[in-house]
Amino acid sequence: MTASRDGAGLTNGATRADQAGPVIAVVGPTGAGKSDLAVEIALELGGEIVNADSMQLYRGMDIGTAKIPMVERRGVPHHLLDVWEITRAADVASYQADARRVVNGLLAAGRVPILVGGSGLYVRAVLDDLSFPGTDPAVRARLERELAEVGPGPLHERLTGLAPTAAAAILPGNGRRIVRALEVVELTGTFEATLPEYRSIYDVVQVGVDRPDLDTRIADRVELMWRAGFVDEVAALAEAGLRDGRTASRALGYAQVLAVLDGAMDSMDAAKQATTTATRRFARRQRSWFRRDPRISWLEFPDVAAALAEVRRLVGSL
């Protein structure tokens, strides 16, 4: 990893000279042990945790997202957990504003912000010089109605005519992404299919956590979810409107249990296996995303003492 010092000044009126200390990011695939390591770093450096897991933003989605229990936080403040209702659609632009406000506040108070999560876009939204188009509920609703009526094919053809590069990067069957791209084109006149270059707005140390036995860890974690009452959690959230949450209802595990409750899948055992398979697939995508970032220092076997020593070394190199 390289420690990032390039890029624009801080948001919300701050400048790089205002930054009192580093921002640390602990990233990597699901199930690798990021949350526990982040707590150790926070205790060592006087830090506070800022959540960068898009599903842990939702209230009540605790077991299935492996939200760190209060006792395991060991007194370390955790920010941006349980802040969204399950019926709210994910909004990275809103998250970016909230997270940067927390990060800048911690820096101003002399604390070390420790960003933790496996949602790669959310991590980059906080750390990098990125901006995101807004949304228009009326436009989105109209496009979603059209998607339900005619399917993704005609919408993808329209996108090809309006923004061919964007259309080429989106599978013709991915209705959700097609709708979002068309919404952005309608609101801004263009759509960027790829993210800009890596350019941090903070002094950043990024540490990646990975495991050679990740597939086994994921299977064990899913088994523990079921034993901990995950099915009951999903059933309770379903009563509270989970099915109406365009984002939350698609979360790993939650979508599979809902499928059983709605008669679209045969059994909870099938849902458990499907959750394990989907989570492993998702972890591979996460790994690929983060491995492309040359700024990340990877800890293949996350020994706490070695990890803390590496973080201290990287902070000292800023």
UniProtKB/Swiss-Prot annotation:
Site (Interaction with substrate tRNA) residue list: 119, 140
Entry binding sites for substrate: 30-35
Cofactor requirements of the protein: Mg(2+)
Enzyme class at the top of the EC tree: transferase
Region (Interaction with substrate tRNA): 53-56
Binding site for ATP: 28-35
InterPro entries: Dimethylallyltransferase, IPT, P-loop_NTPase
Record's catalysed reaction(s): adenosine(37) in tRNA + dimethylallyl diphosphate = N(6)-dimethylallyladenosine(37) in tRNA + diphosphate
GO BP terms, alphabetized: tRNA modification
Oxidoreductase recorded as keyword: no
One function term, GO molecular function aspect: ATP binding
Its biological purpose: Catalyzes the transfer of a dimethylallyl group onto the adenine at position 37 in tRNAs that read codons beginning with uridine, leading to the formation of N6-(dimethylallyl)adenosine (i(6)A).
Name of the protein in question: tRNA dimethylallyltransferase
Taxonomic path: Bacteria, Bacillati, Actinomycetota, Actinomycetes, Frankiales
Gene: miaA
